[in-house]
Design a protein with these regions (language model features):
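Bacterial N-terminal signal peptides that target proteins for export
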Residues: 2-13
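Carbohydrate-active catalytic/glycan-binding domains of CAZyme proteins
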Residues: 25-342
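Accessible peptide chain termini
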Residues: 1-2, 342
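Bacterial N-terminal signal peptides
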Residues: 13-21
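Extracellular attachment fibers and their assembly/anchoring modules
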Residues: 1, 24-25
Length: 342
């Protein structure tokens, strides 16, 4: 074989190899995407505690991964929940979604021992901060709030401070819930002040320092009717909204309050949703995306491989959210259609 033929053969082989690599990547991308065909939104895993983030024209959705284990339905004392990791999904149009897999686990914190409970991810100055609930080991032995950081919305995330941000001894001013320090939510107000809210049994509120990884001042409490857990902060126009899981008739509903500033006063506005189907808990996540507002939440209607939904096997859903002229939010009916294209 002369040198010209050898070069041609090498180029053909390289082209064929490149095509194989491209085909493999394309197939993988297709395997990691799915179409929104109604609620529940995610149908191949049990998911809970949705937390949306909009960044650069893409909506990222962070959820806890509920995983079934033998004997789960007879467990008690919080052991009904087996939430092993946080997953991330993304979309540019609310219809086609990409599954980015696991982006953080409780054991990614050296002091964490398990339980990937409710969280929120925010972006600030090119960094992504993951405020989250973790079961901590010694010397804490309780639910705490940690913070991880990444250069990308899909991770990897690493512990930002090497210890919990908020622990039990810091919140003794609240009426004791099952777990004081769970379900963090973040907002940056119009003055550039960062705030964090969280709680179970009591709704806590605190300022953050400009580095977003230290509290700034005292931890306050917000008196909200029937507050249970799962606060979510957002702003629309001149109003701030504090939406949360409230106690309904035996199960949780979503209620909310509004205020002219993060310092209050907070005015209760009643229920935003009824109880979630087949689920004791419900958890709000509210965001504006592509000119529309959305409420993410979870129920427990998904059946997966013959395993039915339950208190610890939930399924994330989404509905469009509408406002009245006075800024109050219209009651949201939970549907099977959700926001799927018709």
């Amino acid at each position: 074989m002369n040198s010209d033929m050898l070069q041609i053969t090498k180029k053909l082989a390289l082209s064929a190899f490149s095509l194989l690599i491209f085909a493999g990547c394309t197939q993988k991308d297709e395997q990691n995407t799915f179409q929104n065909d109604g609620n529940p939104l995610i149908k191949n895993k049990f998911t809970a505690d949705p937390a949306p983030l909009v960044h650069d024209g893409t909506l990222y959705l962070y959820v806890g991964h509920d995983e079934y284990y033998e004997g789960q339905d007879t467990a008690s004392g919080g052991k009904e929940f087996n939430i092993t990791e946080w997953l991330c999904y993304s979309t540019e149009d609310m219809q086609k979604w990409t599954d980015h897999g696991s982006v953080l686990k409780p054991t990614d914190f050296e002091w964490g021992v398990g339980e990937a409970w409710a969280s929120q991810v925010i972006e600030h100055e090119g960094k992504f901060y993951y405020y989250t609930t973790v079961q901590a080991g010694e010397p804490y032995n309780s639910k705490v709030i940690g913070v991880a950081v990444s250069d990308s919305p899909t991770g990897p995330f690493t512990d930002a401070i090497g210890k919990p941000l908020i622990t039990d001894e810091m919140t003794s001013n609240g009426a004791r819930g099952w777990w004081n320090d769970i379900d963090p939510t973040f907002i940056m107000d119009e003055e550039g002040q960062a705030w964090l809210s969280w709680g179970n049994g009591t709704c806590f509120l605190a300022r953050l320092k400009p580095n977003l990884i230290e509290l700034d001042g005292e931890i306050e409490t917000v008196d909200l009717p029937l507050f249970v857990e799962g606060p979510w902060l957002h702003q629309r126009g001149d109003l701030y909204y504090l939406t949360y899981a409230s106690m309904g008739e035996g199960r949780e509903t979503i209620s909310y309050a509004t205020a002219p500033s993060m310092e209050g006063p907070w005015t209760p506005q009643g229920e935003l949703t009824g109880m979630a189907e087949n689920s004791f808990t419900i958890h709000p996540g509210i965001v504006e995306f592509n000119g529309s507002w959305y409420l993410f939440y979870h129920n427990a209607t998904l059946t997966l491989d013959g395993i039915e939904g339950a208190i610890g096997r939930r399924s994330v859903c989404v509905e469009e959210l509408h406002y009245n002229p006075d800024g109050t939010m219209q009651f949201v009916e939970q549907t099977t259609e959700g926001v799927a294209s018709r």
